[in-house]
Amino acid sequence: MLKKYLPLLLLCAAPAFAKPVLTVYTYDSFAADWGPGPAVKKAFEADCNCELKLVALEDGVSLLNRLRMEGKNSKADVVLGLDNNLLEAATQTKLFAKSGVANEAVKVPGGWKNDTFVPFDYGYFAFVYDKSKLKNPPKSLKELVESDQKWRVIYQDPRTSTPGLGLLLWMRKVYGDNAPQAWQKLAAKTVTVTKGWSEAYGLFLKGESDLVLSYTTSPAYHIIEEKKDNYAAANFSEGHYLQVEVAARTVASKQPELAEKFLKFMVSPAFQNAIPTGNWMYPVADVALPAGFESLAKPATTLEFTPQQVAAQRQAWISEWQRAVSR
């Protein structure tokens, strides 16, 4: 009789022995085979006795848009890939819980004070070009926009992409209220505006543009992985806009303790060592940078709006951009 019911008993008991699943929403290049995602997944799963499930979306702004749409019904335990420019907008959703991670655990330019969002890397937006093809790159954002040179440019949409939003804010920092006219001039040189970074950079590598919006650290990938030194980031005299990428756990998480454990793991060497040669950004912890990073130019001037300024103006500036580029 016992034999008859044994399979049923085992079936009923199976969920009790199943590993908990931590669902992390992130952007596509983080979760890609060539991104830091696989190494992070392996390291965390070895430590947590759980399954780490990475759900990839196109880019950082898309993460916030998705979470807003899902609200408290979201399956995300952690959202990884928002940034300093989305902090206030993300806070206003009331969909994120306090991290449990001390601010002293991270090191970013200007310091960090936030008990909800935890940085995992940082970098500076820049336009990347191929030195073998473009001999005289622009030396400033104004030169890129205003020069008679017929440079072909690709950048990302500020409505879906954090680099795209970064360029929107960079243009505002440099041009102020004259940004609409600057956008119109840049539109004449723009090949396309993509939803996310991966698509834009892929098109650039295929020769579709002379310059692509990316990061000052992007050339490190080509130096280290491909042994090529022909890619460079144009150093702009006005300075470069800072991006600090962050993660946070959700209020709706069914695994709050595991989510907090992940955020603490995120600032540990096991995670941070995957950042320089996985996400090609600067780590927020004291880990050694690989050879190749020392040749990268660091901006003399760092540009940044406060999260509150961005939240107050973002929609108006996006509308301004839309009107300007559609003329």
From Swiss-Prot:
Q: Quick check: keyword Transport in the entry? A: yes
- Identify the residues that bind thiamine: D59, G60, S161, T162, W197, Y215, T216, T217, S218
GO annotation, cellular component aspect: outer membrane-bounded periplasmic space
One GO biological process term is: thiamine transport
Instruction: Tell where it localizes.
Output: Periplasm
Q: What happens when the gene is disrupted?
A: Insertions in thiBPQ cause a defect in the transport of both thiamine and TPP.
The Swiss-Prot or TrEMBL record describes its family as follows: Belongs to the bacterial solute-binding protein 1 family.
This protein's assembly is summarised as:
The complex is composed of two ATP-binding proteins (ThiQ), two transmembrane proteins (ThiP) and a solute-binding protein (ThiB).
Q: What is the protein name given in its UniProt record?
A: Thiamine-binding periplasmic protein
Give the originating organism: Salmonella typhimurium (strain LT2 / SGSC1412 / ATCC 700720)
Gene that encodes it: thiB
